[in-house]
Amino acid sequence: MQEADLIRLKHILDASVEIQSFIKDKTQEEFKQDRKLHLSVVHLLEIIGEAGNQISEEVKEQYVDIPWKRIVGMRNRLIHGYFDIDLAIVWKTATEDIPPLIEEIKNMISSCS
């Protein structure tokens, strides 16, 4: 794996872990009501998507279990549809998709060490 890919994976991991720390002990309703919180999570998801977009095709082909297209697609929807963001989808992504992504990215990084 190239160094650039490893850097991007660390960006994904850092942003994912930060999302988890931000939403820990929060309910979906608290998330929706806290503008600073949901704007922060949206921004971190954008970072994850941008980093995912920069991962080489070689790595994407090697790790097909990671939904690279969905990750990048989420980033695109968040960036270009700012006023139409569905916070229920953001919450679902943060609570259901990010935890397994963290484990997969950790495993990828570990396999490079």
What are these regions (language model features)?
Residues 1-113:
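Solvent-exposed interaction patches of small proteins and small membrane subunits
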